[in-house]
Design a protein with these regions (language model features):
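Charged helix-capping and loop-helix junction motifs
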Residues: 4-10, 40-45
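Hydrophobic faces of well-ordered beta-strands that scaffold small-molecule active sites
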Residues: 23-27, 51, 58-60, 154
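Glycine-rich phosphate-binding active-site loops on the catalytic face of alpha/beta enzymes
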Residues: 1, 47-70
Length: 167
């Protein structure tokens, strides 16, 4: 039923974040912009709430592929995303600015990668690092770091070109 969609979306995003899996919210995010240069209030809220829920990406489809205002649509979605990320009053809850008392994801480490990546993000936050550098063969380290939502950018290096292209 339609009334369950918002709750199910939040649950799916949360489960993906907990598992360190990238999650994209897509489909009809800015549908009115197929024919109009201005989105509806509900569409702007959908984009913002997807970001606040912890989505790694929001994606357009028909709006940018077939719509009359593709550039304006991409620009508007970008403006909404940046506004939410920069001005959310509880930014530390969104991005894990503070790590005392747990990660907000899962206080029990599943394995050594989980423990080490949490430690790296926690340390980066404590010392005020400007970036986190991840060396990876498969991309797993980068994905696991990103699940903790550090405020620092994650710079990924790999000897395997396909891993970098995938990330």
């Amino acid at each position: 039923p339609a009334e369950q969609v918002p709750i199910l979306q939040k649950m799916i995003v949360e489960k993906c974040n907990s598992a360190g899996k990238p999650v994209i919210v897509a489909t009809q995010m800015m549908e009115s912009m197929i024919k109009s240069p201005v989105p509806t209030r509900a569409e702007v809220s959908d984009v913002a709430n997807s970001i606040l829920d912890g989505a790694d990406a929001v994606m357009l489809s028909e709006e940018s592929a077939l719509g009359e205002y593709p550039v304006e649509t991409v620009a508007m979605m970008s403006k909404v995303a940046l506004m939410v990320e920069q001005n959310y009053p509880h930014r530390e809850a969104l991005y894990g600015d503070t790590f005392e008392g747990g990660s907000g994801v899962n206080d029990e480490y599943k394995d050594i990668v989980d423990a080490v990546t949490f430690g790296a993000v926690s340390t980066a936050s404590t010392v005020g690092a400007v970036a986190i550098i991840a060396l990876t063969e498969t991309g797993l380290t980068a994905r696991m770091l990103s699940r903790f939502r550090p405020k620092q950018p994650i710079i990924v290096m790999s000897p395997k070109r396909h891993v970098i292209e995938q990330i």
